[in-house]
């Protein structure tokens, strides 16, 4: 992508994105094209595919839960075409790295609502908590411990007592206790990972 087109695309995207400057958007576009290939190159892919994205989540942001990583991919891939476009990449990273609490609540709820029905069900909580907990060899029935955690989560967060969490339930619980934002599994990067990623993206990519 030539400099003029890059600046044009960065300018258009930076109008949509509130958490990155125009030069930062330029760097993220450059990084995107190193991942998928240059426009016009016959080997260039349609976008960032699921495997490439999972490698980024694992190697750069330290995520290990396959189910959560798959849901994060779906959160970025707004049009559900199985590829992350350059716009989806920059918009997704804006919330992922620097979102407001409200944006992060919306994002995390979308990750945890595994079947997309607008609720985090008892079964979904069970699957996510089971995946995120280390199994103790001494436990006779590890599922019992997970079931207990699900009940604790519902008791604390299910304000309308319908045995599932609506967005309103989740939002209210997190606003009252911010630590509940990632109650069902890590789906946001920590500050150390963010700094390392931005150092690479905003410093090293400018040298390319």
Curated annotation (Swiss-Prot):
It is found in: Cytoplasm, Cytoskeleton, Cilium axoneme; Cell projection, Cilium; Cell projection, Cilium, Flagellum. The keyword Thylakoid does not apply. SUPFAM superfamilies: EF-hand (SSF47473). InterPro entries: EF-hand-dom_pair, EF_Hand_1_Ca_BS, EF_hand_dom, Recoverin. Ca(2+) 1 binds at residues 77, 79, 81. GO terms for molecular function: calcium ion binding. Ca(2+) 2 binds at residues 113, 115, 117, 119, 124. It comes from the Eukaryota. GO terms for biological process: cilium movement; outer dynein arm assembly; regulation of cilium movement; regulation of flagellated sperm motility; regulation of signal transduction. PROSITE patterns: EF_HAND_1, EF_HAND_2. Ca(2+) 3 binds at residues 158, 160, 162, 164, 169. The keyword Cytoplasm applies. Keywords: Calcium, Cell projection, Cilium, Cytoplasm, Cytoskeleton, Flagellum, Metal-binding, Repeat. GO terms for cellular component: cilium; cytoplasm; cytoskeleton; sperm flagellum. Gene3D superfamilies: EF-hand (1.10.238.10). Residues 64-99, 100-135, 145-180 form the EF-hand domain. Component of the outer dynein arm-docking complex along with ODAD1, ODAD2, ODAD3 and ODAD4. Component of the outer dynein arm-docking complex (ODA-DC) that mediates outer dynein arms (ODA) binding onto the doublet microtubule. Seems to regulate the assembly of both ODAs and their axonemal docking complex onto ciliary microtubules. Regulates ciliary and flagellar motility and is required for cilia-driven determination of body laterality. This is Calaxin. It comes from Xenopus laevis (African clawed frog). The lineage of its organism: Eukaryota, Metazoa, Chordata, Craniata, Vertebrata.
């Amino acid at each position: 992508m030539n400099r003029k087109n890059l600046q044009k695309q960065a300018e258009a995207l930076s109008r949509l994105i509130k958490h990155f400057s125009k030069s930062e958007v330029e760097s993220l576009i450059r990084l995107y094209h190193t991942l998928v290939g240059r426009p016009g190159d016959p080997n260039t892919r349609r976008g960032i595919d699921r495997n490439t994205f999972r490698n980024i989540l694992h190697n750069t942001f330290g995520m290990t839960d396959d189910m959560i990583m798959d849901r994060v991919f779906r959160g970025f891939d707004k049009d559900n075409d199985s590829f992350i476009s350059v716009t989806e990449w920059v918009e997704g990273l804006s919330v992922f790295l620097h979102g407001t609490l409200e944006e992060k609540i919306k994002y995390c709820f979308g990750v945890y609502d595994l079947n997309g029905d607008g609720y985090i069900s008892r079964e979904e909580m069970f699957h996510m908590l089971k995946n995120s907990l280390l199994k103790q060899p001494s436990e006779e029935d590890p599922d019992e411990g997970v079931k207990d955690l699900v009940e604790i989560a519902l008791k604390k967060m299910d304000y309308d007592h319908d045995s599932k969490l609506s967005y309103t339930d989740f939002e209210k619980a997190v606003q009252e206790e911010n630590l509940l934002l990632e109650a069902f599994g890590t789906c946001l990067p920590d500050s150390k990972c963010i700094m390392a990623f931005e150092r690479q993206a905003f410093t090293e990519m400018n040298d390319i």
